[in-house]
Amino acid sequence: MKYENELFILNYTEKDKYYIEDFMNYLNDNSKRIMDFFNLEKLSTKITINLIEKKEEIDKIFTSIHNMPAHDFLIGFAKDSQIYYISFNELNNVPKHQNDIYELYQKTIVHEFVHSCNYEFSPLWIRCLCEGLAVYLSEQRDKNDNAFNITKDELFNGRVNYIQSFLFVKYIIENYDHDFVLNLYKSEKFAKENLDRLYDETVEYYQTKNKVK
C-alpha cells in the first residue's frame, strides 16, 4: 500500500493501516521545523519511507547498503532519500525495544527524517554530530539530561553513543549561533578546527552544571 504527499512516499502493508494516518500526521507536523533548521525550503526529491515487516529483512537491507552487519537493536536507518523503518507491529520483538511505546516509535521516524535532511544539506557525515542532532531535533531525550561522561576518543572514534552525542550537540546548539552550528555540518575543515575545543568546553560546561546542582 502507498501514501504520498508533497514531501513523502510511504510504502506499507495492510497490517500497518490502522496507525498510518496518525504516523504521517506526526511526521508532517514536524517536517517544517526540521527543514527550517537546515535552511531547506524544499527537498530535491521526495523522501521514500519503507516500512519493513521483519527485523531480519531490515538487517539484510542495511548490510547490502553499508556492507557491514546491523546492530541487534537497529529498527531504522536513512540513506539519502530512502528511509527503512521497522513496522510498529514488529517493534517490540526487537532487542532493547521490547518496552517501547508508540510515542517513541513516532520520534524515531523523525530522527531518521533529520538524517535525510542532513544528507540533503551536506554529504559530510561526522557521526557524533549527526546522531546527536537527530536525537536533539526528534526530542528523543530529556533536555535536562546532563551526565556527559565520555572520552574524546570514544565520542569521535568509538561506537556510536546516542546519549553522549546528544549532550555534545545540545551544548553546541545552546551556546553558539545557528550559522556556526550549520558550518560544523557543512565544512569538514571548520569541524576539524573546532571539535576538540568544543569537546573540552562541553566537559567543563556539564561539570560546572552538575556542581551547581
Give, region by region, the residue ranges found by the protein language model:
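Acidic/histidine-rich, surface-exposed loop or edge segments in extracytoplasmic proteins
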Residues: 2-19
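Soluble non-cytosolic domains of exported or imported proteins
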Residues: 17-28, 99-104, 108, 124, ...
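Auxiliary, metal-adjacent structural segments of Zn-dependent hydrolase domains
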Residues: 24-82
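Sec-exported extracytoplasmic/periplasmic mature domains
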Residues: 35-39, 114-123, 138-143, 173-177, ...
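Low-complexity, serine/threonine/proline-enriched polar segments
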Residues: 85-89
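Active-site recognition of the HExxH zinc-binding catalytic motif
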Residues: 103, 107-120, 131-135
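Post-HExxH zinc-binding segment in Zn-dependent metallohydrolases
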Residues: 120-161, 209
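Pan-zinc metallopeptidase signature
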Residues: 158-213
